[in-house]
Regions:
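Left-handed beta-helix
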Residues: 1-136
C-alpha cells in the first residue's frame, strides 16, 4: 500500500506542499526499477549532474571504479570501488560491486557490495546489497 492512502485510511493528518521539482513515486518494484533506468536516459528528467540537484551524503573513502581492458560498459552509472571485468549495459551499479569476467548485466540495478560471479547473466533485475549472483 502507498504511504498517503495508508495514512488517510488510518485517519492520520495529511498536509500538502506544492513542490515544483522532480518527484517520482517509487512505491513498487517496477516503479523503483523505472526510476533508476530513467537516470541513465540520454537526457534524464532528473539529472544527477546538474549543479542545483546536488545531494550531499556521508561517503566512505574507497578507490574509484576499475574497468579491466576486456570489460564492456554502455550507458551505466557505476559507484566508487566497483570492479568491472565483464559486461554491463543500461544499468545502475552501486559502490563496491564486482562484475566478474564473463558476467553480463543488462537493464538492472545492482546494489552495493554485491558480486556478480563469472558466467552469471542478469537481465532486468534488482539485485540486493551484499549478495553473490551465480551462474547455474
Amino acid at each position: 500500500m502507498h504511504v498517503i492512502p495508508y495514512c488517510h485510511q488510518r485517519g492520520d493528518k495529511i498536509m500538502a506542499y506544492n513542490y515544483q521539482g522532480y518527484w517520482k513515486d517509487v512505491g513498487t518494484l517496477s516503479a523503483y526499477w523505472e526510476a533508476n533506468m530513467e537516470l541513465i536516459d540520454i537526457i534524464p528528467e532528473f539529472n544527477l549532474y546538474e549543479e542545483f540537484w546536488r545531494i550531499y551524503t556521508k561517503t566512505d573513502v574507497i578507490p574509484p571504479q576499475y574497468f579491466s581492458a576486456d570489460s564492456k560498459v554502455n550507458a551505466c552509472i557505476v559507484g566508487d570501488g566497483t570492479e568491472v571485468y565483464g559486461e554491463i549495459s543500461n544499468s545502475v551499479i552501486g559502490a563496491g560491486v564486482v562484475i566478474e569476467e564473463g558476467a553480463v548485466v543488462t537493464n538492472s540495478i545492482i546494489m552495493n557490495n554485491t558480486v556478480i560471479k563469472k558466467g552469471a547473466k542478469i537481465e532486468k533485475s534488482i539485485i540486493a546489497e551484499s549478495v553473490e549472483a551465480v551462474s547455474y
